[in-house]
A protein has these predicted regions:
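Mature catalytic domains of secreted/periplasmic carbohydrate-active enzymes
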Residues: 126-127, 208-211, 221-222, 226-230, ...
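Active-site-adjacent "subsite" loops/lids of carbohydrate-active enzymes
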Residues: 182, 250-302
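Acidic/aromatic-lined carbohydrate-recognition and catalytic surfaces
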Residues: 220-268
Length: 302
């Protein structure tokens, strides 16, 4: 079965310009493969690690998604064109192997698997361009790999997810409720979200752990891009939150704290530009840089 907990057979680096002073190092310790990258002048964008082996038995693969699944995660045959974010599972009937990266990685990590081996991509870009390490050594990620037998693939997946996340941040109680994006898609109003709260409260009657009613995009004056001020269809959001509590649900709201269109001109030094720098579908062409102290203070106080 698949095992990438060893030194890779090939390492490639992609930088903005020259990569002559860029170095990738790997270290195996405590059943983990540590991947480091350092550079003085070069601005690395991607690290590519490749492990060569032959898959000789029938194998099904399932990978994760970057943020969440929309019902599209599945077991499929080996396909080297599919990128699998964070981790993947390989099942050969009586055995399941999990390969992935520990949570809290210093990059966005994805995997590709084919019959001849496995490739891991470490996206270390900052704001869409190569990261300026200025001599620093960055821990891009920590790879782990486990093999399970005698249990179902689902049980193996749960066990492997515990391996990848040693210190999970779990809520004291289950989080559940409603989110109006999945039927309104940004076209809603104060009256409609109040009705959402009433329906959610009715469906959860008798539960001591009360549900959330989340108001998604469509409540602000400039959807998607900020500033995060209520539009005329919603009015005072604090009043709506208070009404939710009276109804018997916990108020929730959707927001992009690192997007505020007004700040693009007021504080351009706070912003990171996107590669395409386009304003399609009202999406902002920038985002606030959370490494800037003033940005963090603004988000806390806004």
């Amino acid at each position: 079965m698949i095992n990438i907990l060893r030194e890779p057979d090939d390492i490639k680096i992609e930088c903005e310009e020259d990569n002559k002073d860029c170095t990738v190092e790997t270290e195996i310790k405590d059943e983990k493969l540590y991947v480091y990258i350092s550079a003085a002048v070069a601005r690395p964008r991607f690290i590519c690690l490749r492990w060569n082996y032959r898959v000789t038995e029938p194998t099904r693969i399932m990978g994760d998604k970057w943020e969440r699944s929309y019902g599209d995660m599945e077991w499929h045959s080996l396909n080297g064109e599919i990128f699998m974010p964070w981790y993947f599972l390989a099942n050969s009937g009586d055995k399941t192997v999990g390969c992935g990266v520990m949570t809290g990685a210093g990059s966005f990590v994805s995997f590709q698997c084919d019959a001849s081996g496995c490739t891991a991509w470490f996206d270390v870009r900052c704001g869409g361009t190569g990261v300026r390490l200025n001599g620093r050594r960055l821990l891009a990620g920590v790879i782990v790999c486990r093999e399970y037998s005698g249990i179902s693939a689902f049980a193996a997946a749960k066990a492997f997810c515990r391996v990848m996340c040693e210190n999970p941040r779990l809520p004291e109680k289950p989080v559940y409720g409603s989110n109006n994006w999945y039927y309104a898609y940004g076209k809603s109003s104060r009256a409609e979200v109040i009705r959402d709260a009433e329906i959610t409260a009715e469906l959860s009657a008798g539960n001591k752990n009360r549900p959330f009613t989340v108001i998604d995009d469509g409540w602000s004056v400039n959807p998607c891009a900020g500033p995060w001020k209520p539009n005329e269809k919603f009015g005072d959001m604090a009043e709506i939150a208070a009404e939710f509590k009276k109804i018997g649900v916990k108020p929730g709201i959707w927001i992009r704290p690192l997007c505020d269109k007004e700040l693009e001109k007021l504080h351009p030094e706070w912003c990171l530009s996107r590669i395409n720098d386009g304003d399609t579908n009202n999406e902002p062409s920038y985002c606030l840089d959370p490494t800037v102290p003033e940005v963090r203070e603004y988000v806390r106080s806004a």
